[in-house]
Structure formats: structure tokens, C-alpha cells
Amino acid sequence: MSVALSNRFQGGKAFGLLKARQEKRLEEINREFLCDQKYSDEENLPEKLAAFKEKYMEFDLNNEGEIDLMSLKRMMEKLGVPKTHLEMKKMISEVTGGVSDTISYRDFVNMMLGKRSAVLKLVMMFEGKANESSPKPAGPPPERDIASLP
């Protein structure tokens, strides 16, 4: 049954188990980062790692522990910054160092904690600010008459 889980896109108990396993895997990687001396001077590291885990799980659409090109495309569209295929391939290459076509959680955390400025990092950092400043209008659009049209 576990072999078929990764290929089925459904909710319910199977999806909950899949997400629980994914969260456990990401939590283990977070513990590795917390124990790593390289990141010991990083302030608010546990809070940052928890936020990174949430974002990563949100955009890991295939639940395989990697963000692929289509997941990245959806993420950028959701953030209001659509990119071309070529731009997204370049972003993935920058994050992974050209080694892979997908972004693993380790690569994602290294990018977010790293010193170099990645496009994806900037988008992720400012996502919250952009969402707060421009709330989407609710309800039906206002009525217009012919005189108000251009």
C-alpha cells in the first residue's frame, strides 16, 4: 500500500499519514541543522526552521520531499511572481549548485540560511509583506454603468 501512496493524489487517512511522515523527515533534518556548529550563531534558528518546514511542505506538491519545476512554478504564481521555465530552471540550478533538477529540503534550508542572495530567497522573505499590503477584495465587484467605461 505504501508504494501506491506517492502516486495517488487524494485526501483522507492516506494523505494524513503521508504528510505526517514527511513532517517527521523534515523535523529530523531540522534537528541536524540545530546541532550543526556552522549555524550556532544564527538567531531564532528554531523558529526559522519551523517556518521553512511549513513553507516547504506547502509547496512540495508531489509529497516526495522535493520541489520540482512544476511545484516551483505554482509557488511563484501563488506569490504573484510568475516566471518562465528558463528562469525557474536557473533558480533551481542556483539553489542546488547545478547538481539536481529538484530542490531538496536541505538545499532549501541552506539557501534560506545562506549568505548569498537567491531570487527564491528574496521572494520567500517578502511573501508575507506582499500578502499583508494588498488584500484581495471580497464580494461581488461594484456595479458600473456605460458612462464609466473607458
UniProtKB/Swiss-Prot annotation:
Q: Which residues carry this modification: Phosphoserine?
A: 2, 134
Entry's localization field:
Cytoplasm, Cytoskeleton; Cell projection, Ruffle membrane
N-acetylserine modification sites? 2
Note the Pfam families from the entry.
AIF-1
Which top-rank group of organisms is this from?
Answer: Eukaryota
Give the way it sits in the membrane. Peripheral membrane protein
Q: What does the subunit comment say?
A: Homodimer (Potential). Monomer.
Name recorded for this polypeptide: Allograft inflammatory factor 1-like
Record gene name? Aif1l
